[in-house]
Amino acid sequence: MTLAFTTFAISKINNSSTNEDSKVMILCDEHHPFEKGYFKSAIRAFGNSIKLGLMGNSRPEDAASIFQDKNIPHDLTTEEFRLQLVCMAFSWFIFGLFIACLLLCITLVLTSRYPGENENKATEVVPSSNIDDEEKQLSLSDMI
């Protein structure tokens, strides 16, 4: 079973979508060959998704109007268009992981500097001079 990816051509004149059989991805009449690189597309989509997240928009459909001026044609490929939601989720996961590690480090630093009362009492050695004389006598009589 072979997976076939469909690419679309979006024309500026009548805003209609048509199927394209070649391996060329077209968006706003700009051609982007598939051999341009999947890694480069993923990196650009990751950067665009972070920009969208900082602007408070999680939908990649609005990417063209957010990033580019209407007079300047944008070069967002369909592959980057598909990757933006995944990259958005991944960027929020990394951000959450960073915050969790930061909170864990702060907690560990604070607990190492200021031990709790229970831990402090358990590790202290009670000096023998603080024991009453009666307790000393009781302990000596128990030994005999």
UniProtKB/Swiss-Prot annotation:
Glycans are attached at N14, N15. Disulfide bonds: none annotated. One of its GO terms (cellular component) is membrane. Its main location: membrane. It is a single-pass membrane protein. Residues 120-144 are annotated as: Disordered. This is Putative uncharacterized protein YOR186W. The lineage of its organism: Eukaryota, Fungi, Dikarya, Ascomycota, Saccharomycotina.
